[in-house]
């Protein structure tokens, strides 16, 4: 059954490698479960409802990508797009989150049409091979920078934009996080050099265990105001009935005072950012995985773009901002993921 669905032998992989790759991708993008509810709650949405919507939209999108395109690309509400949703459309422009969700829904429908008519595929194939390789390298550097920021190894600075972490000044928060990140990075690199396919996953798990030990010993201290949370697993049960507060609400949007021109501007903003975000991600991740053919084209690209478009509209109906293909999928690809099973 699994072989028939995902063609593991044809792609020179096996179930064990694909599962490890899938877990690796999940671990690298799980941060969205905390970040997305926080960001969209600024638009007036219930954070618990957004958490559930984020999970469901990610599930629908990733399953669509796996079953329609058989690619190891995970989907979830996109960073940047959720910030635009909350702080620009609902914040500066003053529209309700229901109107914003409707814009995302319509964007997804437009994308479905563009995908079925091969317009998005034509744009993807029109990108020169040299640019595709450049995008792949750029995305790698982008992920590395995000990782350094998340690990607090680099922090913002008014003079130089970024600078190194002050280990001594904030030892119990920033400092210990940076040290743990360095330890995890060293472990991951050593395992990767030695050929362990689960190197990234093992590195993440070891770092987490060391983090919990640091918290237990008082070396790492929780400071919610500064964004340093408990590293222990939470046993708190989510109230799943909250999903009713966002599910289908895009169809109840009140357009009084919005104006058709303003709605089109919002729609086009979501449309173009999502289009090139998805294309850039597919180029970078597929290039890293060696999935491009001799003409530097991605086989079955139409199905991949269609899955992404379906996820966008489905996510809006469920109650979250634009659901898109995640560049963190490259971590799973690096762990050996080659099919939708990952």
Give the location of each predicted region:
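Alpha-helical transmembrane segments of multipass membrane proteins
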Residues: 59-67, 88-89, 112, 185-190, ...
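Helix-loop-helix hairpins and the membrane-proximal interhelical loops
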Residues: 1-49, 165-169, 204-302
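Helix-loop-helix junctions within the multi-pass membrane cores of secondary transporters/permeases
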Residues: 2-36, 57, 78-87, 91-139, ...
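Membrane-embedded alpha-helical modules
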Residues: 93-209, 213, 342
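Transmembrane alpha-helix interface/packing and boundary motifs in multi-pass membrane proteins
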Residues: 61-73, 189-192, 269-277, 308-318
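Short, amphipathic, aromatic/basic-enriched membrane-interface segments that mark the entry/exit
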Residues: 42-50, 69-74, 163-176, 333-342
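Membrane-helix interface "capping/anchor" motifs
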Residues: 63-77, 190-201, 334-340
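Active-site cofactor/substrate anionic-group-binding motifs, chiefly glycine-
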Residues: 46-92
